[in-house]
Amino acid sequence: MRSRKGKLYSCLLGSLLVLTTVSAPAVAGFSFGKTVTLMQFQDMHGHLAPHAEIFPDERKDPNSGGIAKVATLIKQVRASNPNNLLLAVGDTTHGSAETTFSLGDAIMPALNALAIDVFLPGNWDFGYGPRVYRQRFVAGDYSTVLAPNNRTTVAWMDGRPGHEGQQCNTPGGLNATTYATCHVTKANFPAVAINLYNYNEVARAITGQTHPGYLVKNVGGVKVGIIGITSDVVPQQAQAFNTGFRFTMGYKELPVNIAAARAEGAELIVVLSELGLAKNIQLVREFPAINVMFSGHTHERTPEPIIIKRGLFGSNIGIVTEAGEDSFLGRLDITVYRGRITGYNWQLLEADSSVPEDPAIKALIEQETKTFVAGPDHICHTFGPNGFPFGKGHVLCDPLETVVGHTNPTIERFNVLEEVANNVMVDAFLDLALSLGETDSRGNLLTSDNTLSQTNGFRFDVVVLGSDDGFSGDITLGDLYDYYPIGATGALAEFTGGRLMDHWEGVLTNVFDPNPYRQRGGWFLGFTHNMHFDVELNDDFPRTITQGRIDLVTINGKKLDKSTTYTLASCYPHGNPVDEVCRTTGATNVRYVVGTPLGSGPTDMFGNRPLNISGPWYTQPPVNSANIFDPVRFANGGPLFLQVAPFNSSHPVDALRRYLATHVVDAGTHGLGRINAVTGIPASEYGGPGIVQPTQGAGPAWLKREFVLFDKD
């Protein structure tokens, strides 16, 4: 646990201007103002049970995190100061096998038991599609009917505790089309977002805000205005995530909502933002009315708060914090006098092995997850991909604790350029592709000279402790879903080297843009063992605004040829245009990797069995290749999305299981070195050496956004 106390100067106007030194507050016994405690609960990513973690002091702990440990910390904080708020910052209901195969419902009883005061949705809270999102988070919306593929995923919950009376699987069986009684669990806490709008896809018109932009809470006599800014990157994710919504960055809406909260008497303005640390720091610099910024999305950890000094002698400050994932709880004790911060104390509390699980929350989790682990309650589950008919999808039958591989080095995702976990993933995709005996559209056999793979720069993960560090090194099936909890399918597609290079340059620009408002997405991509990158991130390397960070790319030792066509083995997010693979558009000769279901063993409730990891594997073309998304067709009674990938198409976890059955994760094979930052990665301007993604980006100073108060669009 780290603590940072603040000492501020408060300007009091009387007959003379007086400067008064104010010491840092304690929760009790401080007389100069009123102290409220704000808790930052952030980026849970569906982590229900404890897991391994690496803490900022490099300590490796095998029993950390999980919502029940965080609940214990929340109770301890509440006991120390009754004047508190629990503020949840996004990406909560998505990120694990249990949440994927329940559309987030597995975590909802525990979340509803925490007494969250205000919730801000993150980009992955939209990951099950707009119908699930509206049912769960939009107050008063009980009429939205789940899509057939959604009902496939949650049909197993019919009649279980908390789902009494739910009818997702009856009447109608495989012929079911609509169920007004099929639903996901409703959140009992309010959501805020100034930048999320309802959108009529047919009329192409905004129809109002989805949530209130802010709420004002009276906490021990201090009125706190809590404003929400959800993630602005949802439109760049799978198309099915944002249908019926429109997102802005919130820049224009922010001053309006600040003024409205102030008009309701708010003395303290707290912004919950899923824009990421760099954007959020810039907002605090440009909007002096923001007192506290609880930042999310980028998974950074700030053991010490980032303080933005403004006003005379720095008397007006903005406090920016980010509290990692579920292994932490942020605590900010803040003292306010006449609408001014007179002191603060920030602690990044650690949910490590010394913190017990809250018994009541643990019992809720065990109830929701018992069908996923070995025992009498274990069953098969099915995730229905977008566009699939009811009763079809990706089948999970093995318990999540099943050991599926071994790692020598410790695995995590916490590096802006390259990670062992991503290297393993793309090597698994490539290995499967090369095993198929396929040829490309020109008749060339797929080899490591003409075939490659990439994976998105995801941040969600769990730490898997390796045998090199004295631990078992076991990789479980649940671990694999923590690294790939989305319902994509394996795909092969062809791109020119020039198209791939343009995409990679664009991603590097998104990650390292010197203008924080142009930073977006996750971290950089993962690439296969037959690839090598030299990238230049320093300020003086010649480049244009969008090109020039990549100095060299080789495939099997040969320089990438922009005119040559390569085969990319990667993922297809269901519902996207057919020519888009792994967020790279312009694909040709797209086909999907399909497996063979097991011939015996358990089935899901629809009679489906999981794919045989041993094969055989082959490819099939798209089921549909045009007009995949059509809101007019939907308005006339047809499907909003068409099925693209065939039945029995592979999931990335299938490729990983196949690969790990014959390969040990090893630093020599999967270690860092595929991406070489020739001049290094610059240290972050804000937040200290522990910040993974430099907040100022990397590149020429002339590309930066200058700090101008009251800047206009």
Question: Would you name each region that the model predicts?
Answer:
Residues 29-353, 424-431:
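Acidic, metal/ion-coordinating pockets
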Residues 19-26:
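C-terminal segment of classical bacterial N-terminal signal peptides
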Residues 2-12:
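Bacterial N-terminal signal peptides that target proteins for export
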Residues 32-41, 46-79, 113, 243, ...:
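Catalytic centers of hydrolytic enzymes
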Residues 14-17:
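Sec-dependent N-terminal signal peptides of Gram-positive bacterial secreted proteins and lipoproteins
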